[in-house]
């Protein structure tokens, strides 16, 4: 039990299994599924291998989902990974996770998606553009520009933050609508593509000679990195575990069901892409979703794909804004963040201050334009935290054998071991391929160490 000093109201359990599952599906499916396959085709130019790598990536993600499901059921509290790392390794490691997600990963992701959304909104609203400047501001010898696109991106961040400020039910209702809409649009593109599209099943025939074992493993590794990151977000319901009804059941099942739904959707849409285009025409194509739609339905179809992407990005933005503030809220409850962030809104029962501080920082990143570089540097940190969380399953089984576990990982210890091993390989590849960014990412995490001890001293002083 935490000191009363840090207790400022309680979050309420208002989310059911459907809500929690839609949060996960909405978070995972962003823009990646519309852009990643072209990059995979460049690494593995074979239709069967492309489908196989998506299935393998989905199965590895499912291993992670089953691993996190046990932790989420055993510790259904706000914060997700922050809670599990704190329990397994100590408060410093939990704090470093929360610090990195607050300082870079979550606000940076929100900023990146909000800016990415502008590229698609321009098609329907030409006045909103990152190239159309409203004002140039002189500050410390620099002259940053504020464009209409940045203003719209900031407005989008504040709009969804305001919705979630008004309570988890309001945020989850919007999430449900956006997630169902994005699933519907992806299914429509896929099914109609097979039914009435101008594609060919001959595109699935293998005409490419695979490289030797060493080169093939390198190509497979590059493709797997892209796939794994297209599945990022499969554990986000754990952040709102303290607001989910029957959490011992609904938290693990939301993770598992959400991952399985996305696996099915990803497999289907990739089959539609391959039905539309031969692999040679997909290699290196970033906007593979639009390219496939034009091949299936004609040039005008790209408009509908753009709409699907807009809906998809909006759903992913709302999902992060809904879930991520619970991490900082949990940190503040432990005295490791600003005390005001620990407060629950008396009427809306939301972590209101946590939502506000995330919105402000996200908008600063939108304005500064530095989020892209920061996110690139934190890939290694994200992988490291996931590996540590997977290992926490083993540690807590030994250290806390009496901890109630309403759900236990199926296939233990092989399933968690497969998850940890696969992520270790991906981490090694990331460090080898981008050592500078990897080291910078670890440096960002390391910056949290002195900040942790600063907060720890503040706790000691308050409780003295």
Enumerate the language-model features and the residues they cover.
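Hydrophobic alpha-helical segments of multi-pass membrane transport proteins
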Residues: 122, 186-189, 328, 378-405, ...
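Membrane-interface "cap" regions at the ends of multi-pass membrane proteins
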Residues: 1-38, 42-47, 61-66, 75-78, ...
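Membrane-interface loop-to-helix entry segments
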Residues: 148-199, 232, 255-256, 378-388, ...
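Hydrophobic alpha-helical segments and their helix-loop junctions in multi-pass secondary transporters
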Residues: 118-128, 180-208, 228, 271-277, ...
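Hydrophobic transmembrane alpha-helices that form the core helical bundles
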Residues: 39-42, 54, 62-157, 162-165, ...
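Hydrophobic, membrane-embedded alpha-helices of multi-pass small-molecule transporters
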Residues: 15, 19-34, 153-160, 193, ...
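TM-loop-TM module centered on a large, flexible mid-protein loop between adjacent transmembrane helices
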Residues: 83-84, 90, 122-132, 208-211, ...
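C-terminal membrane-solvent junction of multi-pass transporters and transport-like membrane proteins
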Residues: 148, 340-349, 386-437, 462
């Amino acid at each position: 039990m935490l000191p009363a000093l840090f207790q400022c109201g309680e979050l309420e359990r208002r989310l059911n299994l459907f809500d929690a599952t839609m949060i996960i599906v909405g978070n995972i499916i962003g823009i990646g599924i519309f852009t990643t396959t072209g990059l995979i085709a460049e690494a593995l130019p074979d239709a069967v291998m492309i489908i196989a790598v998506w299935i393998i990536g989905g199965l590895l993600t499912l291993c992670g989902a089953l691993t996190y499901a046990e932790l989420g059921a055993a510790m259904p509290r706000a914060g997700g990974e922050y809670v599990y790392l704190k329990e397994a390794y100590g408060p410093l490691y939990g704090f470093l996770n929360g610090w990195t997600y607050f300082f870079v990963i979550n606000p940076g992701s929100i900023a990146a998606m909000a800016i990415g959304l502008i590229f698609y909104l321009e098609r329907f609203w030409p006045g909103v553009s990152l190239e159309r400047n409203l004002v140039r501001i002189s500050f410390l010898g620099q002259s940053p520009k504020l464009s209409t696109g940045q203003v719209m991106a900031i407005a989008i961040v504040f709009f969804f933050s305001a919705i979630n400020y008004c309570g988890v039910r309001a945020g989850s209702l919007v999430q449900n609508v956006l997630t169902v809409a994005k699933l519907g649009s992806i299914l429509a593109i896929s099914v109609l593509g097979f039914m009435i599209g101008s594609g060919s099943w001959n595109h699935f025939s293998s005409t490419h000679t695979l490289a030797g074992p060493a080169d093939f493993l390198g190509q497979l590794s590059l493709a797997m990195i892209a796939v794994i990151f297209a599945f990022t977000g499969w554990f986000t319901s754990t952040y709102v575990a303290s607001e989910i009804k029957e959490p011992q059941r609904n938290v693990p099942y939301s993770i598992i069901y959400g991952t399985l739904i996305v696996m099915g959707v990803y497999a289907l849409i990739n089959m539609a892409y391959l039905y539309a285009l031969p692999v040679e025409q997909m290699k290196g194509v970033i906007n593979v979703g639009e390219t496939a739609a034009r091949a299936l339905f004609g040039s005008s179809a790209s408009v509908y794909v753009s709409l699907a992407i807009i809906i998809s990005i909006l759903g992913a933005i709302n999902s992060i804004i809904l879930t991520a503030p619970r991490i900082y809220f949990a940190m503040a409850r432990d005295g490791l963040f600003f005390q005001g962030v620990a407060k629950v809104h008396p009427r809306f029962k939301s972590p209101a201050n946590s939502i506000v501080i995330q919105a402000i920082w996200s908008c600063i990143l939108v304005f500064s334009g530095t989020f892209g570089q920061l996110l690139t540097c934190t890939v290694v940190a994200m992988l490291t935290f996931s590996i540590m969380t997977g290992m926490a399953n083993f540690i807590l089984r030994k250290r806390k054998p009496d901890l109630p576990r309403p759900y236990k990982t199926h296939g233990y210890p092989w399933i968690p071991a497969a998850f940890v091993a696969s992520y270790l390989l991906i981490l090694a590849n990331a460090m080898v391929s981008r050592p500078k960014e990897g080291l910078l990412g670890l440096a960002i995490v390391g910056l949290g160490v002195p900040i942790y001890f600063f907060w720890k001293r503040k706790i000691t002083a308050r409780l003295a």
